[in-house]
Each structure stands twice: as C-alpha cells, then as structure tokens.
Amino acid sequence: KAVKEGADGILLAPANSNSLVDSCEKVRKKKIPVVLIDSLINSTEFDVCYMTDNIDAGEMAAQEMLTMLHDAGNSPQEPLAVGILLSSDASQAMVNRVSGFLDYWAKYAPTKWEITKDIALNGGDVEKAESDAAKLLKKNENIKGIYGCNNTSTVGIAKTLTKQKRTDIVMVGFDMAEET
C-alpha cells in the first residue's frame, strides 16, 4: 500500500525474518529505500538496519539472571532451573537473544543450575505467555527463574508471577511495556 501511495521509503520492524523477504525485494526493485529496525530479514534487500546486538543482549540477560539468582540466596551447590519464553523462533532477534543467553549460561552458571529443555513459544499472545509461564512453574519444582525474550513473554511472565504471588521467582525480560 505504501508503495502504491508513493512512499519515499519504507521502515519495517520484522517479527519474522522470512516473511518480508519478497516484499522487500519488490520495493527495492522500485528503487525505494528499505530501513529495518530491530531485526534483519533473510536477504540483503534492504538499505540499513538499526538494531540491538541481540547476542550481546542475551548474554547480559543471562548475567543479570545469574546475579539475581545468587542475590536471592540460591546456592550454587543446589539444583535449580530457569525457563525461557519467547514469541517466535522465526525472528532472528529472538534466536540471537536465546543464543546469547544460553552461551553465557553454559560458560558461567553453576553446573547444578540448568535451563529447562522446553522453550515455550507464545506467538506474540500475552495470554499464551501467561499460560506458558504458569505451566512452567507447575511442571518444574526447581524453577527459580524465567527469562522473557520479548515484550509479550515478559508481560505474560510478570502477570503470572503477580497473580500467583510468586516473589520467589527471578524474572529477567526484554522490551518492558507499561503493564510490566
């Protein structure tokens, strides 16, 4: 629609690194600049991308999670688990945030502190993120932390922890919205 209306440029924040490839290629063939925000697409058909180094951001999230777990009095000699929630594994930003988190965790977390095997995908739905967080807490008796890789996940985790009055759980999340 923007192209038909004579846009001088297109600004996109891709939630899926694949879904906009064809559209960006068509726009670029018309010599209209494409600027990406926050995530790359799986193509070189864009002019510039302004984004966070999401691997580094994931590492910082893991570092913060470890600090908060230690500060909460969790012993490195006792087993504990941390869960991960994200909106989509089709977003390179999400993939990189998880990758950075897992890499840092593998290097620096006590050996008895583990990441749960199931990473929950909520599809950008806050209610699903709430449900996923509640299931994670119910399923894992050793859960002491939850990492939300995006706003939807962070909001869902915060709502669940608040509803359940779970002050014993450490939460680290991205993209803080007003409701969190």
Task: Mark where each language-model region is.
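A residue-level marker of the well-folded mature domains of exported/periplasmic proteins
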Residues: 1-180
